[in-house]
Amino acid sequence: MGKIIGIDLGTTNSCVAIMEHGKPVVIQNSEGGRTTPSIVAYTNKGERLVGQVAKNQMVTNPENTIYSIKRFMGRRFEEVASEIKMVPYKVEKGQNGDARVNISNIKKQMSPPEISAATLTKMKETAEAYLGEKVTEAVITVPAYFNDAQRQATKDAGKIAGLDVKRIVNEPTAAALAYGIEKKHEEIVAVYDLGGGTFDISILELGDGVFEVKSTNGDTHLGGDNFDDEIIKYLITEFKKDSAIDLSNDKMALQRLKEAAEKAKIELSGAQEASINLPFITADANGPKHLQYTLTRAKFEQMVDHLVQKTKEPCLKAIKDAGLKASDINEVILVGGSTRIPAIQKIVKEIFGQEPNKGVNPDEAVAIGAAIQGGILTGEAKDMVLLDVTPLSLGIETLGGVMTKLIERNTTIPTKKSQVFSTAADNQTSVDIKVLQGEREMASQNRVLGNFILDGIPAAPRGVPQIEVSFDIDANGIVHVSAKDMGTGKEQKIRIESSSGLSEEEIERMVKDAESHAEEDKKLKEGIEAKNIANSLIYQTEKSLKEYGEKITNQDKEAIENKIKELKDALEGSDISLLKSKTEELQQASYKIAEMMYKDAQASSPDQNNAQNNAGSESKEADYEVVDEDKK
């Protein structure tokens, strides 16, 4: 078995790690960063940018720069109304009811898994550059409170990126693995994970290499983005008061406000106030307008208090579901960049009655845990067992629109449960099995994961047929359901794929698109490198002509000038092979100047000249070898 990489596919940033010699290692990307912005952009030339380069052009290209796409993963369009208001790009309803992004620069509607796949591809390439070998397998993390559709969407993203996703792991569980890899004694830990777009709380029991999740809870609509949004709303309100100009419909201004808000939030974790200066934010008839405010930590904490308080209830529920009291918990581990906010650390202390443990890097712990899980699967991380849970209850709709639960939330996975049902009407020959996920009593109040029909049931009075419904949740938290007529033995099975999910055909098409993008990216890089070499050669040759042009024949000088012109013309076009051949031709022609420079250097150094003469023919042979090497 090859290497299995661990990927934290985050809302704001992503991170990749690998097990080496029994230890997890975080891999730096090509820009030298240990985390990569989860941002994908498309330029007006249709070029795809991923990571920091995409982030760098957000302000000037807001409608084609996609960030926080994780908030839309596996979601139906009607479920993301609040998320749509937070982003400048266009989110539309897809053909099958899911949320999709319309990217004007490439005139294409893209699914969230397809966009996330671009970030996963960057992570995959980062690992491949480090390892010097192809990577095809990964463990990818998701928020613990992700439902089945969101988990399936994450697996689809991995497939589109050319990765066989060996395991989907809950982020708090991964962080606990990172924390507990070298811990030998038994303890109960709480993982408080506040990322860019989601909040999770998990309670785990650690001991003797066993990591057992006791309970989990969370909010998939709460994260650092919401804190940024509060600052943005405040700045828009204050600026409108001062200048009577509303910035809320100016997409470029909003993008600048988002950057400034994120920066101010980060600054306020270490300072009591942050200055926000955005010159030329807009203009009116009187000229340009500048935005300048000072935000204090006290004001910020007042603005976000309702968000901070929203994390309290899930924590209390998780403690209760685990059958514990807050005082039973030995350590509280903070994960996610937003846990650096002092108000968050304060409420954690209030809930659990202790200072949180800050020994784990909140940006890297999840990827490290994913790499450890990869090591468990390959056998590199020995004597470790991970027992996770399903975050939400699963069941089916029964008579009267009631949800009948088969698997309760916080059940250890993998698991399988069966229950026998019957028909609701006389002579009923088929049953429609509607699969639900959630905690409400009525079916209509829970999420429909999918439905299927078991037909061919022999006509009989109601209540007579025996239909066994079985739920099977695998280690990834993905649901498989079957229904069997006990009388005839006829069985119908499905792997739940949300009605708003991607079809196999769509995934295959997206895989091919991703592969073609990889080829495009390679060609683009090759073209840029060829242009850089050509420009550098033109500059050096023109400089040398100025200095030594009088010392070569007019014929040679004219030939070099012609080759420079031909190379400049090739630079204007898009034919890379022509550019390379013209670069080679100028290189050959410029050797005449190199000869003159060499002779000049010899003439100006008599001692060196004598030494060269004494060296005899062997020295000349070496010179020719070096020139020959250059030609290669």
From Swiss-Prot:
InterPro entries: ATPase_NBD, Chaperone_DnaK, Heat_shock_70_CS, HSP70_C_sf, HSP70_peptide-bd_sf, Hsp_70_fam. Coiled coil: none annotated. Keywords: ATP-binding, Chaperone, Nucleotide-binding, Phosphoprotein, Stress response. Residues 602-617 have a biased composition (Polar residues). One of its GO terms (molecular function) is unfolded protein binding. The modification Phosphothreonine is found at T198. Pfam families: HSP70. CDD domains: ASKHA_NBD_HSP70_DnaK-like (cd10234). Induction: By stress conditions e.g. heat shock. Residues 598-632 are annotated as: Disordered. Residues 618-632 have a biased composition (Basic and acidic residues). It comes from the Bacteria. Acts as a chaperone. Belongs to the heat shock protein 70 family. This is Chaperone protein DnaK. It comes from Borrelia duttonii (strain Ly). The gene is dnaK.
